[in-house]
């Protein structure tokens, strides 16, 4: 039984929407193109095993770790489920 304005499957739709957003964000972070032999940040050689494991890699392990630490944590806020986004 639906209550208010939400349909019976609104919770599942919200969960699926959140998952789809996370997948799209993760796919957007995948490197593309040809792997570099040297790190574009520090110039250190990128090991062959890393280049084979991650096609399109552009950073050495150390620089990638530093970049990952600087990345803001994902808050989990879903704008599609926000009242404000629906009122505008």
From Swiss-Prot:
GO terms for biological process: positive regulation of secondary metabolite biosynthetic process. The keyword Zinc applies. It comes from the Bacteria. Keywords: Metal-binding, Zinc, Zinc-finger. Disulfide bonds: none annotated. GO terms for molecular function: zinc ion binding. InterPro entries: Znf_C4-type_bac, Znf_DskA_TraR, Znf_DskA_TraR_CS. A zinc finger (dksA C4-type) spans 39-63. PROSITE patterns: ZF_DKSA_1 (PS01102), ZF_DKSA_2 (PS51128). It holds the Pfam family zf-dskA_traR. This is Uncharacterized protein YbiI.
């Amino acid at each position: 039984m639906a209550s208010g304005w939400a349909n019976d499957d609104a919770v599942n739709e919200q969960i699926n929407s959140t998952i789809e957003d996370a997948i799209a964000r993760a796919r957007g972070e995948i490197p593309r193109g040809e792997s570099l032999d040297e790190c574009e940040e520090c110039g250190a050689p990128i090991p062959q095993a890393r280049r084979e494991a991650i096609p399109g890699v552009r950073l050495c392990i150390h620089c990638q770790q530093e970049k990952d630490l600087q990345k803001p944590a994902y808050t989990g806020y879903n704008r599609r489920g926000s009242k404000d986004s629906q009122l505008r």
